[in-house]
Structure formats: C-alpha cells, structure tokens
C-alpha cells in the first residue's frame, strides 16, 4: 500500500488557486466517494481550509498524477497549474507531514490551534463517508495524540504572534482578569476586528467600538454584543474605559494628552491601559507621560511578537522530535500489521488445502474405500501440499547460493543448519 499526502498551501499556491480547489463541507462526502471511485483510494481524508487543500490517501500504485487529475476535474481547474503549485509526500514522509499540519507546524502562523480542529473535522467527515479503515484510524488517532502532547508539553501556542493578540495578552497580564474591565476600541479595520474577537473571548465587562463610519463599527460590534460610538462621542465616554486600543488610518491623533488627562481626572486617577496600533499614531506620545496612563505602541508590541516567534520556533523543534517518535511508532505498527496479514493469508491457505483434502477423503470413505488406505493417502497429500511452497523456496535459495534466504527458511521451518553442531 502506498500512503500519500498531496496538496497545495499558502506557501506554494496563490489565493486564487487555493479558492478554486477548496471544498465546502457540503461537498466533502461527494468528493471522498468520487476520490475512492476514480483513483482507487482505499482510505482517504481531505483537509480544506483557507490556507490549504490536502488529500491524504492510501492505495495500491497511487500516483501524484492521478490525484492532480482528479482534483482538477472535480473543481474544473487546470491540471498543469495544480501540478506546478502542488507538493507530494510518500510513506513515512507523508505521515510526518500529516502530523506537522495537525500540530500547527506547517501553518501560516506557527503553532496556531485552529488547524487541529479542522483536521479532526476532516477525519470525522471521512469516517461518515465510509472511507476510513484500520490504517487511517490508527494514523489519525496517533496524530491527534501527538498534537495534544505538543500543546501540553511545549510553548508552541502560549505566546502571542500577532499585534492584535499581543495587545490583549498584555492587557490581561496587567489586569490579571479582564472580566471587570471596560474596553474601548477605536477603528474598524481588520486589526480592531481581531482585537474585538479576542476581547469578547476573554469575557470583558463591556466592549465598545468607536469609528468614523458607524456602519462599519456596527458590523464588528453587533455579533459580539458590543456597543458603538462615533469618534465625536469618545470624549464623553473615555472616562469609562479601563482599556483603550486604537488602530485607524487617521493622519492626525485621535486621543491627545489633554483629553486623556481629563478622563483620568474624572476616573479619580484609576489607571488606564492604552495601546496604539496605528501608523501614524492615533494617541499622542505625550500621553505616556501621565502618571496613571500606561501607553504602548505598535513597536513595543512588535518586539513582544518577535520574541514570542523565537519562542515558538524553539518549541517547534521540540514538537518535531515528538512527531519523529510518533511517526516511527506508527511505521512499526504498520509493518507489524503487514506480517499479521501475511500470517493470516498463510493460515487461510493452509486451512483451505486441509479442508479440500478432508472433503475428498470423506467422499472416498462414503464410497466404501478402506479407511487405512484413505488415511495414509490423506496424510501423504496433506504433507506434500504443505511442503510444496517451502521446498520450492529452499531449492531456489540453494541454486542461487542465497545463504541469507536459506538461513531464514531454515529458521522458519525449524531445520538445523548444515554447519550447526549436532545435538
């Protein structure tokens, strides 16, 4: 059986191609059945996210060309374009790749946790489609096991590697818990949207989004149960904010020293944590001079992020070692399964030969043939039948002077070797 991991991802293919060959959840069952029918895949899993589409499959004589052709035809894409932007791994390399993906080592953001859930869902879809057997059941359970171990035993996911998440983590570090904090976000771009989601996950007491265009602020706030403000309403509400995070495209500061100073006075100098993620700055640098204002800029956070990336890269080396060990364990199990299959086939073949000869003997007895003669004939035929294949193998090894195979056959058949001392 050939095990293959084939696909495209953010490192090998542009977003236009990734979009073209992505699978929706509704199409997954149809896709898996089509893959099995048209390529002969015995077992398969398809992982499809915004950053990758990968096919993990096992079959006799499965090739990258067959998978490329199938994927192109299923999505009406160009096979040559797919071929130029794809990659393929075989056997143990494929196993390691699957485990790396599930552990987040192959992700756009090193160590991101979402991919594990996506791989698990892909596996569930494959099971529901009836294309999972014992090999892939074992492979993916070991994959999930090593991913869990990587999460619990390394620092792969414990440090922020985006300024949005870093700002939330820094606020959490300062306030210990954010559940009693009022948060004001200024802006409505992608960064603020990410910050809003992270803050919502932390269970903040109150979340407000202020923006020049109220409709855009509402698009972020409404799904999270947050309130919205216009920029002109900020002065009246700033005193209520324990945490302020700003990221707009404004060419002039949104918050000046005087405005923040008045807000702190109204707060009776209760500390305020401010993060300026904008370039040019949204918050005047002089705000940092105020006793009860703790101002951080995008440069401060970038230093934290870079340090955290280094930490994750170190953790990734630890994770890779765990993957090597788990992949080796799976390969040993797989090899053991192959020997079990051979033994099962040998036993079935022997039992079939026995049953055939017994049936003939019983027929002879029913016809009145002498029992002693039937038993002797049965014994001779059974002996000849069982030693036929080993005899051929021994003769072949002897003729080819293949001492290694000769020794293996002698050991397997319990025969004393020619140079062994008699006992």
Swiss-Prot record:
Listed binding positions for NADP(+) are 187-192
Which residues participate in substrate binding? Answer: 49-52, 107, 112-114, 118
Q: What is its EC number?
A: 1.2.1.70
By its UniProt entry, which InterPro entries does this protein fall under?
Answer: 4pyrrol_synth_GluRdtase (IPR000343), 4pyrrol_synth_GluRdtase_dimer (IPR015896), 4pyrrol_synth_GluRdtase_N (IPR015895), GluRdtase_CS (IPR018214), GluRdtase_dimer_dom_sf (IPR036453), GluRdtase_N_sf (IPR036343), NAD(P)-bd_dom_sf (IPR036291), Shikm_DH/Glu-tRNA_Rdtase (IPR006151)
- Its top-level enzyme class, in one word, is oxidoreductase
Q: Which reaction does it catalyse?
A: (S)-4-amino-5-oxopentanoate + tRNA(Glu) + NADP(+) = L-glutamyl-tRNA(Glu) + NADPH + H(+)
Which GO biological-process labels does this protein carry? protoporphyrinogen IX biosynthetic process from glutamate
Name the UniProt key words of this record, in alphabetical order.
Answer: NADP, Oxidoreductase, Porphyrin biosynthesis
PROSITE patterns the UniProt entry points to? GLUTR
User: Which positions does the site annotation Important for activity cover?
Assistant: 97
Q: In which pathway does it act?
A: Porphyrin-containing compound metabolism; protoporphyrin-IX biosynthesis; 5-aminolevulinate from L-glutamyl-tRNA(Glu): step 1/2
GO terms for molecular function, please?
glutamyl-tRNA reductase activity; NADP binding
What else does the entry mention about this protein? During catalysis, the active site Cys acts as a nucleophile attacking the alpha-carbonyl group of tRNA-bound glutamate with the formation of a thioester intermediate between enzyme and glutamate, and the concomitant release of tRNA(Glu). The thioester intermediate is finally reduced by direct hydride transfer from NADPH, to form the product GSA.
Q: Report quaternary structure and partners.
A: Homodimer.
Recorded hits in NCBIfam families, A to Z, give:
hemA (TIGR01035)
Free-text domain note: Possesses an unusual extended V-shaped dimeric structure with each monomer consisting of three distinct domains arranged along a curved 'spinal' alpha-helix. The N-terminal catalytic domain specifically recognizes the glutamate moiety of the substrate. The second domain is the NADPH-binding domain, and the third C-terminal domain is responsible for dimerization.
Q: What family, per the record? A: Belongs to the glutamyl-tRNA reductase family.
As for what it does, the entry says: Catalyzes the NADPH-dependent reduction of glutamyl-tRNA(Glu) to glutamate 1-semialdehyde (GSA).
This one is known as Glutamyl-tRNA reductase
């Amino acid at each position: 059986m050939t095990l293959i991991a084939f696909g495209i991802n953010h490192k090998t293919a542009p977003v236009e191609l990734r979009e073209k060959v992505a699978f929706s959840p509704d199409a997954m069952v149809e896709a898996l059945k089509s893959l099995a029918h048209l390529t002969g895949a015995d077992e398969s899993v398809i992982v499809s996210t915004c950053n990758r589409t990968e096919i993990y499959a096992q079959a006799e004589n499965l090739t990258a060309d067959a998978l490329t052709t199938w994927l192109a035809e299923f999505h009406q894409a160009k096979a040559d374009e797919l071929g130029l932007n794809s990659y393929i791994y075989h056997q143990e390399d494929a196993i390691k790749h699957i485990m790396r993906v599930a552990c987040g080592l192959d992700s756009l953001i090193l160590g991101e946790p979402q991919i594990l859930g996506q791989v698990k869902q892909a596996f569930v879809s494959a099971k529901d489609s009836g294309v999972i057997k014992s090999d892939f059941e074992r492979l993916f359970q070991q994959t999930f096991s090593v991913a869990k171990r990587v999460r619990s035993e390394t620092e792969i996911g414990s440090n922020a590697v985006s300024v949005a998440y870093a700002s939330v983590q820094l606020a959490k570090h300062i306030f210990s818990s954010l559940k009693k904090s009022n948060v004001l976000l200024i802006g409505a771009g992608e960064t603020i949207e990410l910050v809003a989601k992270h803050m919502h996950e932390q269970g903040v007491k109150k979340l407000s989004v202020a923006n020049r265009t109220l409709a855009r602020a509402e698009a972020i706030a409404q799904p999270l149960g947050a309130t919205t403000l216009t920029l002109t309403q900020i002065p009246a509400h700033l005193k209520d904010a324990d945490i302020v995070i700003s990221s707009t495209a404004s060419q002039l500061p949104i918050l000046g020293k005087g405005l923040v100073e008045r807000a702190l006075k109204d707060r009776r100098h209760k500390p305020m944590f401010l993060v300026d993620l904008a370039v040019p700055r949204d918050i005047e640098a002089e705000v940092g001079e105020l006793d009860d204002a703790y101002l951080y800029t995008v440069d401060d956070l970038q230093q934290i992020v870079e340090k955290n990336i280094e930490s994750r890269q170190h953790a990734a080396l630890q994770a890779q070692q765990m993957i090597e060990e788990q992949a080796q364990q799976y390969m040993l199990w797989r090899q053991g399964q192959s020997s079990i299959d051979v033994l099962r086939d040998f036993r079935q073949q022997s039992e079939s030969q026995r049953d055939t000869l017994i049936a003939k003997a019983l027929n002879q007895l029913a016809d009145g043939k002498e029992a002693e003669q039937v038993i002797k004939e049965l014994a001779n035929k059974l002996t000849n039948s069982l030693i036929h294949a080993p005899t051929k193998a021994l003769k072949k090894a002897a003729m080819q002077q293949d001492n290694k195979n000769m020794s293996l056959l002698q050991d397997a058949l319990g025969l004393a070797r020619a140079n062994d001392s008699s006992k």
